[in-house]
């Protein structure tokens, strides 16, 4: 029970921070405002985060929360390829509507230069676990190719998804991310399907 409350506290801080970052911008948001918005304490904040900059890496875990929300909506017998498209569409819509593009750009740049934690590559995240589960099921169903290992296909999917996000950041959000993904992502991951 205590572990669940700790996770809930951290989640409240992360959600409040990203809400404020989106509304006010990263630079104009203070730690004090995050604490107030989250309804937590200064001690709780600094228990989880060294400072505001540490919250940039939490975006990956915010994405995981979206996957945790979506997972129960996926039928066990659903076509795995279609499920992958669904997850991508839902995630990128959430990012486009709630994540400040400047912050996403900052996250990607810090992931490229950091020597510490790189949450986008953490295979213990819900993101990677769910992808492994879906791709394994797809191989068992015969809808996703079985001549490649599950982890290779997971890596490929993640690489394609990051490509869409990175390109959107490079172009400074000049187009709809979700519409671009709707058009391009099926082509990008079509090679994961079983060849007929």
Predicted region positions:
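Basic, helix-initiating cap at the start of DNA-binding domains
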Residues: 1-24, 28-40, 54
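Short coil/turn segments at alpha/beta junctions that flank glycine-rich nucleotide-binding fingerprints
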Residues: 23-27, 77, 98, 141
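Short hydrophobic/aromatic patch on the recognition helix
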Residues: 39-49
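Alpha-helical DNA-contacting segments of helix-turn-helix folds
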Residues: 49, 56-63
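Hydrophobic alpha-helical connector segments
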Residues: 58, 72-98, 150, 154-157
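Amphipathic alpha-helical packing segments from all-alpha helical-bundle domains
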Residues: 68, 115-143, 151-155, 159, ...
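Amphipathic C-terminal alpha-helical segment
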Residues: 93-97, 128, 133, 137, ...
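Amphipathic alpha-helical segments used for helix-helix packing
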Residues: 95-115, 166, 170
């Amino acid at each position: 029970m205590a572990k669940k409350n700790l996770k809930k506290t951290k989640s409240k801080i992360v959600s409040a921070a990203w809400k404020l970052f989106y509304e006010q911008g990263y630079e104009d948001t203070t730690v004090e405002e995050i604490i107030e918005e989250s309804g937590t304490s200064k001690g709780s904040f600094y228990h989880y985060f060294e400072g505001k900059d540490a919250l940039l890496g939490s975006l990956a875990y915010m994405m995981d929360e979206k996957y945790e929300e979506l997972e129960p909506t996926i039928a066990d017998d659903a076509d795995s390829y279609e499920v992958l498209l669904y997850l991508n569409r839902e995630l990128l819509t959430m990012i486009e509507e709630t994540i400040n593009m400047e912050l996403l750009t900052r996250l990607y740049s810090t992931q490229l230069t950091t020597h510490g934690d790189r949450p986008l590559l953490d295979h213990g995240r819900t993101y990677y676990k769910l992808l492994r589960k879906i791709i394994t099921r797809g191989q068992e169903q015969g809808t996703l190719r079985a001549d490649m290992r599950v982890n290779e296909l997971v890596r490929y999917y993640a690489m394609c998804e990051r490509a869409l996000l990175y390109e959107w950041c490079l172009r400074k959000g000049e187009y709809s991310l979700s519409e671009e993904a709707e058009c391009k992502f099926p082509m990008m991951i079509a090679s994961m399907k079983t060849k007929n």
